[in-house]
Amino acid sequence: MFPSISNISLSPSSLFTAYASLTGFLMLFRSLFNDEVPERLRSYITDLLNRFFTPKSKNLTMVIDEIIGFKRNQVFDAAEVYLRNKIGPETARLRVGKLPKQKHFTIYIEKGEEILDTFENSELRWTYVESENEASQKEKRYYELTFEKKLRDKVMNSYLSHVVAESEETKRDLRAVKLYSRDVRASKDDDGMAGAGWGCINLEHPSTFETLAMDPGAKKKIIDDMERFLKRREFYKRVGKAWKRGYLLYGPPGTGKSSLIAAMANYLKFDVFDLELSSIYENAQLKSILLSTTNRSILVIEDIDCSSAEVVDREADEYQEYEEGYYGRVTLSGLLNFVDGLWSSFGDERIIVFTTNHKERLDPALLRPGRMDMHINMSYCTGLGFRTLVSNYLGLGGLNHPLCEEIEALIDSTEVTPAELAEELMQEDDTDVVLRGVVSFVENRKVEISKTKELEGSTCRKLDGDDKHNVSSTNDLKKTKKKKKGGKGKAKGN
């Protein structure tokens, strides 16, 4: 009935005839479709055909604008910081900048550049776009995040939170640590703390745990404690405790208490709030000041034993305080209320540090278990601490010097502070001369301590002898009085 394909002529004339017939049919169909089919039905059929014949994309693209309404988009700012650490050698164009007070150069990707990222074995592509906004005549900036559609839930629930968290960590690492004090004039760099009476400077203290002249075991214990504290947000919430940590640093002057605080701040990237209790007049002012401190900070009250003179007895009532002229002053109970009382729950990631040269002078309430979480004894320098000082001041060559072992043995048998040894190590540039000077210094210190102890011993013996002599004289006097009384009695009897 139908001719076989092999019998159909494929000459150019036959092909042209078939093409002309097909074209005429399509034009007639189009004319009838446009004229006879209602517009709504035509639109529906057209959309249906477009969907059917358009290939479906496996990818989804999210647009992250710089501005949402009139405010900056937190995700855009986080992505800008996050992608700095993802720039690879395949990136062709970069933007570089640096503000006057920044220590490091800041790198951004340029318009049109793409960065590939991997998250939990899934690939995602970031593209930075700048386009001119016709309405405002300003450039519109945004990121395009492209990934497979099946990853949508993972991106929304995990990846974007990961980007924000990583960017915050990067900003903390790059941010300069600040030292706040109420004695420093407030400026525009105070991060909004000027209204609370705090002024600040950048804490450029070079102290780190590597340069700290402490026993390595003690340093490791402190670092491990701080790391554990940072990771325990949910733990503190679960057990019903405020997310804070308290440290009491005690020991003689010059043993490195202030250096340890600076090392803690540099390690944690926490701001330091240095509080002078002598400048505070009442508990209400103390409350206002402490509430104005920020999260991720270290509150320092140095020489708390000396500050105690400015703090009224916690057991005194208001009438007694008024009679003694202390009405309205800071009370110890008011201070302790911020350490572990009701007001201790303000803020998160807070560290409180008290320092003292004389732990035995502190009120027992400050030493109660659980009040300060860790008591750190900043003792005299040890042999291991001296090795750290030698490495800091003389380099690795000084550690191999034959005098080092002799000095370490001398230090372990006497009382000398790291500050005193550091002063000696700065006297000369020549290692031999410096170490011989340290030997002489430590030997002289040992002799001085021995003489002081002998003098104290002889003084105590003399006082004991005087006491015994006084007791003996008193007894003799009593015996003499008794004899006199006895003699008078006999005379009367006669």
Curated annotation (Swiss-Prot):
Catalyses which reaction(s): ATP + H2O = ADP + phosphate + H(+)
Pfam family, one: AAA
UniProt keyword terms in alphabetical order: ATP-binding, Hydrolase, Magnesium, Membrane, Nucleotide-binding, Transmembrane, Transmembrane helix
Cross-referenced InterPro entries: AAA+_ATPase (IPR003593), AAA_N_dom (IPR025753), ATPase_AAA_core (IPR003959), ATPase_AAA_CS (IPR003960), Mitochondrial_chaperone_BCS1 (IPR050747), P-loop_NTPase (IPR027417)
Subcellular location: Membrane
Main location: membrane
Induction record: Induced in roots by salt stress.
Residue ranges, compositional bias (Basic and acidic residues): 459-470
Record flagged with keyword Lipoprotein: no
Enzyme Commission number, as recorded: 3.6.1.-
Membrane topology field: Single-pass membrane protein
SUPFAM superfamilies: P-loop containing nucleoside triphosphate hydrolases
GO molecular function: ATP binding; ATP hydrolysis activity
Amino acids binding ATP: 251-258
Keyword Transmembrane: yes
Class of the enzyme per the UniProt entry, highest EC level: hydrolase
Family affiliation: Belongs to the AAA ATPase family. BCS1 subfamily.
The name this protein goes by in its record: AAA-ATPase At2g18190
Origin species: Arabidopsis thaliana (Mouse-ear cress)
